[in-house]
């Protein structure tokens, strides 16, 4: 089961980078992972992306291994959903970074879209992308302290106004709703109740300047 690797690889043409598959490691391959990181730091690779083993479980060794290296920047855990356990680190004295993405498919997708992709834009010297707005078609309630990235369906009315409908099945392991979606709805922190008709920030699931209507 390596759907996350295939998904990221499928985006390589859209995001202007060459993808090299580093393979799959087992739960007990902590030492192998450490050796791979060291090898990648010494190579021409600019960005290391992992998927899984970043939470707080017994076999989630990625944070512990990454912290063994000399780092100039490190964070783990953000008040978002999906993707809360995401990890980022920059290695000292080399222009290389690592993103540790959560293992659930939707978490991987959201974190790539909202963390890895903006980083790529930055190193390419491209201006930060701005969301477009759409009217909410259904009420939504969430935790006030958390930013939510929601699988949604974008449509347009007869007079050309954009509308967004939040889909059922927002759990990070549910693929069907992700396949049925064509946009990410970003529901900001500091607010719990989002009412029908409210304008919501929207992002294409695979980057800007692409046709997101199906």
Region spans (language model):
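Residue-level recognition of alpha-helix initiation/capping sites
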Residues: 3, 57, 144-146
């Amino acid at each position: 089961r390596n759907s996350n690797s295939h998904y990221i690889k499928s985006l390589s043409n859209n995001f202007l980078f060459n993808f090299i598959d580093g393979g799959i490691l087992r739960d007990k391959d902590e030492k192998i992972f450490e050796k791979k990181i060291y090898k990648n730091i010494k190579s021409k690779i600019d960005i290391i992306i992992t998927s899984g083993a970043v939470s707080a479980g017994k076999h989630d060794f990625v944070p512990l291994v990454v912290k063994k290296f000399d780092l100039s920047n490190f964070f783990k855990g953000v008040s978002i959903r999906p993707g809360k356990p995401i990890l980022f680190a920059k290695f000292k004295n080399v222009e290389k970074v690592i993103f540790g993405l959560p293992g659930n498919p939707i978490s991987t997708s959201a974190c790539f879209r909202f963390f890895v992709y903006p980083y790529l834009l930055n190193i390419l010297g491209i201006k930060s992308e701005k969301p477009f707005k759409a009217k909410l078609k259904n009420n939504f309630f969430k935790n006030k302290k958390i930013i939510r990235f929601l699988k949604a369906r974008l449509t347009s009315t007869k007079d050309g106004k954009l509308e967004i409908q939040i889909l059922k099945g927002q759990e990070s392991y549910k693929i069907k709703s992700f396949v049925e979606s064509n946009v990410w709805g970003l529901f900001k922190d500091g607010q719990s109740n989002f009412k029908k008709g409210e304008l919501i920030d929207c992002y294409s699931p695979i980057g800007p300047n692409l046709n997101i209507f199906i």
